């Protein structure tokens, strides 16, 4: 039986969240819908308007439209928006990343406003992109919102700490079991657990796709469930659907590279996906690691090359 899809209430209080559609679209990876909803919604207070703008600009970041964020968020903007701008600067300026991280380190060493959840999320995102998951986790542990917990779970799963991820998920479920983020985090953990939990994870991704929209995030989640169950051809069909939506989406291309190997596709098929990934995301960690492995192989091959 599929899990329930969350309703538009916040924190189990029964209070309707004016920004539910904006947040929900962002969480499932429907970034253009998030932007459209944010521009349409009428809000009851300036605080809610800042919160709306945070999700609006984060959606632009997810679309790699860094210039929009850098142009529109001014020095006089709210602290939450300044945090989004900081992440935009990091993503947009590869040659300035070290100095941005140093400045962030200085800021973190001072007294941080832990009620500014957006700052904690953006700081953790910078640390994680900078290959410093420990600093990202330390930052997130200062917050107690669902987004901080969900990001903590993502990082713990990447570190193969399923035990800690399950504990964090329990905290999310205690806070709001039916929230979209809790449902997604449950699917991620179930995917890592494997076995009979794979079908439960698939149901969550499928239910959210049916109810909301079959986004790239949800389609890749479904494909991961199929792959983990050995249903490679079914996974390929789902990933092709994702590729039709965005031919340069990194997770889709990486999953297709792995899938092609399992299906015994000709080398040129795998190389084509790899070339697409390089064209769209030359600095992606997968590409960097792949090229490092290629260089290692070339060095080893040279050692065993016959001497003239």
Swiss-Prot record:
The modification Phosphoserine is found at residues 13, 45, 99. Its main location: cytoplasm. It comes from the Eukaryota. One of its GO terms (molecular function) is structural molecule activity. GO terms for cellular component: COPI-coated vesicle; COPI-coated vesicle membrane; Golgi membrane; nucleoplasm. It is a peripheral membrane protein. Coiled coil: none annotated. Phosphorylated by PKA. Transmembrane segments: none annotated. Pfam families: Coatomer_E. GO terms for biological process: protein localization to axon; protein transport; retrograde vesicle-mediated transport, Golgi to endoplasmic reticulum. Keywords: Cytoplasm, Cytoplasmic vesicle, ER-Golgi transport, Golgi apparatus, Membrane, Phosphoprotein, Protein transport, Transport, Ubl conjugation. It is found in: Cytoplasm; Golgi apparatus membrane; Cytoplasmic vesicle, COPI-coated vesicle membrane. Disulfide bonds: none annotated. The keyword Protein transport applies. PANTHER family: COATOMER SUBUNIT EPSILON. Oligomeric complex that consists of at least the alpha, beta, beta', gamma, delta, epsilon and zeta subunits. The coatomer is a cytosolic protein complex that binds to dilysine motifs and reversibly associates with Golgi non-clathrin-coated vesicles, which further mediate biosynthetic protein transport from the ER, via the Golgi up to the trans Golgi network. The coatomer complex is required for budding from Golgi membranes, and is essential for the retrograde Golgi-to-ER transport of dilysine-tagged proteins. Belongs to the COPE family. This is Coatomer subunit epsilon. It comes from Mus musculus (Mouse). The lineage of its organism: Eukaryota, Metazoa, Chordata, Craniata, Vertebrata. The gene is Cope.
């Amino acid at each position: 039986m599929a899990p329930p899809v969350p309703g538009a209430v916040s924190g189990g209080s029964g209070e309707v969240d004016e920004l539910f559609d904006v947040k929900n679209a962002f969480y499932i990876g429907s970034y253009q819908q998030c932007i459209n909803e944010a521009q349409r919604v009428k809000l009851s207070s300036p605080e809610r308007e800042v919160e709306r703008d945070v999700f609006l600009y984060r959606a632009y970041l997810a679309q790699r439209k860094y210039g929009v964020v850098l142009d529109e968020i001014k020095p006089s903007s709210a602290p939450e928006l300044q945090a989004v701008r900081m992440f935009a600067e990091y993503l947009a300026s590869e040659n300035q990343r070290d100095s941005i991280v140093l400045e962030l380190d200085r800021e973190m060493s001072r007294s941080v406003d832990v009620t500014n959840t957006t700052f904690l999320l953006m700081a953790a995102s910078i640390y994680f992109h900078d290959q410093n998951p420990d600093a990202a986790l330390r930052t997130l542990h200062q917050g107690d919102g669902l987004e901080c917990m969900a990001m903590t779970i993502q990082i713990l799963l990447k570190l193969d700490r399923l035990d800690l991820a399950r504990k964090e998920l329990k905290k999310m479920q205690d806070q709001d079991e039916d929230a979209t983020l809790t449902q997604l985090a449950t699917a991620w953990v179930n995917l890592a657990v494997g076995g009979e939990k794979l079908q439960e994870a698939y149901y969550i991704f499928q239910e959210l796709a049916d109810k909301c929209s079959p986004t790239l995030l949800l389609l890749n989640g479904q494909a991961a469930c199929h792959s983990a169950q050995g249903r490679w051809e079914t996974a390929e069909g789902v990933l092709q659907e994702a590729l039709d939506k965005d031919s340069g989406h990194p997770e889709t291309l990486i999953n297709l590279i792995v899938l092609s190997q399992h299906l015994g596709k000709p080398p040129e098929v795998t190389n084509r996906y790899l070339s697409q990934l390089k064209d769209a995301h030359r600095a992606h960690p997968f590409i960097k690691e792949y090229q490092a492995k290629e260089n290692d192989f070339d060095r080893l091959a040279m050692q065993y090359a016959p001497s003239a």
